[in-house]
């Protein structure tokens, strides 16, 4: 029969060997999470009041409608708008900032969500002072044409149950091509 000392040594070795897969899984999870955060930072290139997403070929306004880009951040009060008001503002932005500005699709706006962050669930370095609530998309709900999709940056969820006359925040986007 093996001595107590040998049995203890064997038990310790077995515990280490059994714990190794869990340790590896934990480390791999940390690496993946870190890589995802780095990829998000690399995907969005900041340029003053704009953020370019080269992967999806989009250019975002860093500030919500109502805010202005000043001193390297978004300042001012975010305007809560109906869909009709958002479309009017979008037309004004196209005139003043060049063509192409529009309300994002639900998929485009959902792409800005950072699931592992606290509210607001968005890269706050790229999109400072973001409203911790719902933002309009240009997509109507499939239930009825009176509902539109929104993306909520407090919860990180999408909703298709907001009436067009309700007021939400707006962040505009346009297609971007590299010349």
Feature-to-residue mapping (PLM):
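Boundary at the C-terminal end of the N-terminal hydrophobic targeting segment
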Residues: 36-41
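Bacterial N-terminal signal peptides
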Residues: 24-33
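Short, structured beta-strand segments at or near domain termini in extracellular proteins/domains
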Residues: 161-179
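Bulky hydrophobic/aromatic "packing anchor" residues in well-ordered structure
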Residues: 57-60, 136-137, 172
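An exposed tryptophan-centered "aromatic clamp" motif
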Residues: 87-100, 106-155, 161
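Bacterial N-terminal signal peptides that target proteins for export
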Residues: 12-25
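Short aromatic-cysteine micro-motif
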Residues: 49, 54-102, 106-109, 113-115, ...
């Amino acid at each position: 029969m093996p001595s107590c000392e040998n049995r203890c040594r064997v038990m310790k070795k077995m515990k280490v060997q059994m714990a190794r897969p869990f340790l590896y899984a934990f480390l791999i999870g940390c690496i993946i999470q870190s890589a995802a955060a780095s990829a998000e930072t690399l995907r969005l290139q900041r340029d003053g009041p704009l953020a370019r997403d080269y992967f999806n070929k989009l250019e975002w306004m860093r500030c919500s409608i109502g805010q202005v880009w000043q001193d390297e951040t978004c300042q001012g009060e975010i305007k809560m708008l109906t869909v009709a008001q958002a479309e009017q503002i979008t037309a004004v932005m196209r005139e003043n900032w060049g063509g192409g500005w529009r309300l994002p699709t639900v998929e485009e706006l959902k792409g800005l969500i950072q699931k592992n962050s606290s509210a607001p669930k968005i890269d706050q370095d790229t999109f400072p002072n973001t409203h911790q609530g719902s933002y309009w998309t240009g997509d109507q709900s499939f239930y009825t044409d009176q509902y539109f999709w929104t993306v909520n940056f407090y919860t990180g969820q999408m909703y298709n149950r907001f009436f067009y006359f309700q007021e939400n925040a707006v962040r505009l986007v346009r297609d971007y091509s590299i010349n």
